[in-house]
């Protein structure tokens, strides 16, 4: 018998990368592929040991793709086996979770009907994957997703086919059925859709009734519908759940502003819509290609199967052969018609979805173009505001530094003012002491002047007295020379002669005292004059120092007032104004007009 299964390769395509992402998850560029080979034998199990088993599909996950692992578990009830699914990457992306109840349980019909000796019911069997034999090898290259199927060796002898020891009542197909390897799942969230095609093979050589054939057709149609629904759900899963599909490869961004985050979300949604639309388009193309290929391969496979059945059906009567061939052809025609109707319905739904997505895409593009100028304007305003904020911060730092320097300067000036006030108080005390000493000296000087005046008066009196005595003496000498006196008693003349030297001595003594008094008066007057000059110089020095202290005190006071006003302006938040002067009482008095305390 000829080959029954068909090999239809899925075409993978990659979705677009998220353009807004600044950090991409870079993985290895080497694509890992999992090739699964099957020998193409259709085994029909009628025994209780090996023919009754349950095929449980397990979904395994590798780094770059999902695959379905088929394992055989023996059970005791009469139940058909389930086949492995080859519909591409289940889920499409790494972050998608599947519910076990979501995809229906698939029961693909093997298109070969076999009647057992005990019961006349039709039993569908599953494809049992085994290792490839030397005759049929499926080559898959990592550079391409296409697969080549090599021809198989000629049919096995009938003795091997009909051996009851291998499998009771089982038939083997000489053609090798091969299932395409599961497609790779790249790290850029790409997925493949491989349409599931259930081959239609000839019916069993042991015959069958129309009722059994009808039951097989109904069962096979339900399985085909389940497979198509699963394939379509795989193709449109990203459209139904765009948020889940992007969890695995979500983009990481730094914190942005509200407007920028909104624009970023809109761009991501637009990219998701574009990706979903492209995937739907490619899925539609793949399904269309698969349908065309199926329609083209069906007549060829039918002819091949008929040619293979001809040499083996010579032992059967011609009526049974024609009946079997007619049943197979009718079954194939019905199946092709059903598939055609299903594909047309899927095409119409996909076209409607494509129109809807194109409309949404155009609306998103219009929104993007409308938001672009507003976004640019907002970004420009944000840049300007950030520049102004940085400038204000710099000015604030400079103002704080200036305030700190002014405060330190004010503290130093206050300390200097305190020291100057202490010195001024000390000088005032010293000035008061000097003034009191000057007053006492003035009083002493007045006393000395009064004493000098008294001495002068006494000296004048003594001088007048001496002049009178000298005049009397000259008169007496003149009289004595002109008129000698008569001799009188000796005692009188002797007394008079003795009185003259005494008077002369008294006169000399008085003259010496007068000279001494004059010298003392001159010395005292010169001393007083010198002391007066010294005290006058000291007074001038004290007055000069007082004027300097008053001037420095006024300058310090004005400077403190200016600094206090500047600090008040800075505390109120006003800018530094123009330099100002302080109007104080007596602040504009010139240096020459400052009068010291009266001494």
Curated annotation (Swiss-Prot):
UniProt keyword terms in alphabetical order: Cell cycle, Cell membrane, Cell projection, Coiled coil, Cytoplasm, Lipoprotein, Membrane, Myristate, Synapse, Tumor suppressor
Lipid-modified residues, N-myristoyl glycine kind: 2
Pfam family membership, one: Fez1
Tagged with keyword Cell inner membrane: no
Post-translational modification: Phosphorylated on serine residues. Hyperphosphorylated by the cAMP-dependent kinase PKA during cell-cycle progression.
UniProt similarity note: Belongs to the LZTS family.
Protein name as it appears in the record: Leucine zipper putative tumor suppressor 1
Organism: Mus musculus
UniProt gene name: Lzts1
